[in-house]
Regions:
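Helix-biased detector of long, well-ordered alpha-helical tracts
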Residues: 1-200, 204-209, 214-354
């Protein structure tokens, strides 16, 4: 809807809402810019403390996806007028625990009365304007890495129905409460960018990425070129891959469905019909951009559209560096999986193979 409004023109806005990036970026001065994002939603689990942790993890994710460091947060609370305040206290405590882990300070917030509980944060981070990672810039030959398994949407739906196995719940909660901080730290500390193309509005511009996005160790043996990055959240894997492809210059993407990591219980939830409304909407919107290889199971197709809460990072990295990046992430405890590649644009935007 914001796209329908008259545009404001401010030269300090480095990243706005033109291209579905994960957060906005506003330059303060040489070497300093703010990263800003906001997210809040209804409970996806029964335990209030865990819900608070998940909400905080999800709210912080967009700052990490841009390569930023979270600094401050404002809590956003919708809560029933006659609700049990001890429940709200537990939600806030859960959120605080993750903000402390992230090194992000809660400096206030706002609450309103609402029949349905909702919770999240507006998060402000800091970033070097020359080190912003965007969802555009993927180049033919790049490999795609994913740092978390899919399935939180369908499993959360099973949880709401009281039909999720405890092992499914445990796996989903572990994923949804794991910050993308470590993965982002590895990427921002060890990458160097090369010249690339990013779409801006209706035009395509060439950017000298070595000056726009440079790592801290550009001349070291362990430097690697990350051309684009985003986190997998409400639009599902296909939706965010679509955004990355459209934001890049004349590329398409091939996903290898057998390599896409899935949470325990994800396929079982799909087969049992635990389909969230967001998944259906994602599929209706984006499936026109997808061509499936023969033999892809229906439940696999479905889970590729599953809306994720606090999902992992999707990273487009040069092929010659993907092995080193995987090694660094794995050494840091991040289970990065290579599950796709970027191709020159020809025909369908997204191709799904087995």
């Amino acid at each position: 809807m914001l796209g329908k409004l008259a545009r404001q023109h401010d030269p300090n806005v480095l990243v706005g809402f033109d291209h579905a990036d994960d957060a906005g970026v506003y330059q303060l001065g040489p070497g300093s810019a703010l990263v800003q994002t906001v997210d809040f939603f209804t409970p996806v689990v029964d335990d209030p403390y865990t819900f608070g942790q998940i909400a905080a993890t999800n709210s912080l994710s967009d700052v990490y996806a841009m390569g930023g460091k979270p600094l401050t947060a404002l809590a956003l609370v919708c809560f029933p007028e006659k609700g049990d305040l001890e429940i709200l206290e537990r939600i806030l405590a859960g959120g605080l625990s993750k903000m402390i882990e992230a090194g992000c300070t809660i400096i206030g917030g706002h609450s309103i009365r609402d029949d349905e509980t909702k919770f999240g944060y507006a998060v402000t981070g800091l970033i070097d304007p020359g080190k912003v990672l965007r969802n555009g810039g993927a180049q033919p030959g790049d490999r795609l890495l994913l740092t978390k398994s899919l399935g939180t949407g369908v499993i959360s739906t099973a949880i709401k129905k009281g039909l999720a196995k405890q092992s499914w719940i445990d796996a989903a909660v572990s994923s949804m409460t794991t910050l993308n901080k470590i993965a982002a730290d590895v990427i921002t500390a060890g990458h160097v960018e090369t010249t690339g193309h990013v779409r801006t509005g209706a035009s395509t511009v060439q950017t000298e990425r070595s000056s726009v996005v440079t790592g801290q160790r550009p001349n070291s043996d362990d430097a690697f070129p990350v051309h684009a990055m985003t986190d997998i959240t409400g639009f599902g894997l296909i939706g965010h891959v679509r955004e990355m492809a459209l934001a890049s210059d004349n590329v398409s993407v091939r996903l290898y469905s057998s390599r896409v990591p899935l949470l325990e219980g994800a396929l079982e939830s799909v087969r049992a019909g635990h389909i969230p409304g967001g998944l259906t909407a994602n599929r209706e919107f984006a499936e026109c951009a997808v061509r499936y290889e023969d033999g892809i199971a229906e439940e696999i197709k479905t889970v590729l559209f599953d809306p994720q809460t606090a999902g992992g990072l999707l990273i487009s990295v040069a092929s010659e560096s993907v092995g080193e990046l995987k090694r660094m992430l794995t050494s840091a405890g991040v289970p990065a999986v290579e599950m796709g590649e970027v191709l020159p644009r020809a025909g369908d935007l997204i191709k799904v193979s087995s």
